[in-house]
Amino acid sequence: MEKSNDHDKASHGGSGGGATEKWEETSLGIRTAETMLRLAPVGLCVAALVVMLKDSETNEFGSISYSNLTAFRYLVHANGICAGYSLLSAAIAAMPRSSSTMPRVWTFFCLDQLLTYLVLAAGAVSAEVLYLAYNGDSAITWSDACSSYGGFCHRATASVIITFFVVCFYIVLSLISSYKLFTRFDPPSIVDSAKNLEVAVFGS
């Protein structure tokens, strides 16, 4: 009888250890994927920032630089902030169990949302400026500028396109951080007054 009990304990212990190892492997895989996803925007942000910083042109019509346009200056600052946050958040996400605490989950959720809207706004206003630079606006007698400053417009366009790739990464990160936060809460429940039963809204 004692041998049988010992055997049962050993088998339960073995299965428990296997489950723990499997959970740790899954957790490590998720953490690695999230870390890589947070690192990816760093290079893109730096690329968009550098391209825009070097964007200037001088010809017989005069000189133009990214610093002459508020939207492009905002794009540079937004990409700089995004690169710094991406690097810092990737370092924190790579730490074992560091991102599992509730304050960290809330922090990632809020900052991921904030950075998504920040970079999206920078890309949107810069794209609007580029549209006017390429097409002008006949209603207010604005002529297009890109026919005279083609190189400037091409570099600005490249920077804006890269910025929208950053936005795509941050949309995915926002979805991940939202999922990690809201799966910690129980689904709301309703009370059936006729049966006096409490039923989960999303089922069992």
From Swiss-Prot:
Disulfide bond annotation, renumbered to this chain: none
Positions of region (Disordered): 1-21
Keyword tags: Cell membrane, Glycoprotein, Membrane, Transmembrane, Transmembrane helix
Pfam families referenced in this protein's UniProt entry, alphabetically: CASP_dom (PF04535)
Acyltransferase listed as a keyword: no
Superkingdom to which the source organism belongs: Eukaryota
Signal sequence bounds: none
Membrane topology per record: Multi-pass membrane protein
InterPro entries reported in the protein's UniProt record: CASP/CASPL, CASP_dom
Tissues with expression: Expressed in the peripheral root cap and leaf epidermis.
Membrane topology, Extracellular segments: 54-74, 135-155
Bias type Basic and acidic residues, positions: 1-11
UniProt-annotated location(s): Cell membrane
Glycosylated residues, chain numbering: 68
Transmembrane segments: 33-53, 75-95, 114-134, 156-176
GO cellular component: plasma membrane
Residues on Cytoplasmic side: 1-32, 96-113, 177-204
Record bears the keyword Transmembrane: yes
Subunit description: Homodimer and heterodimers.
Assigned protein family: Belongs to the Casparian strip membrane proteins (CASP) family.
This protein's name: CASP-like protein 2A1
Organism: Arabidopsis thaliana
Classification lineage: Eukaryota, Viridiplantae, Streptophyta, Embryophyta, Tracheophyta
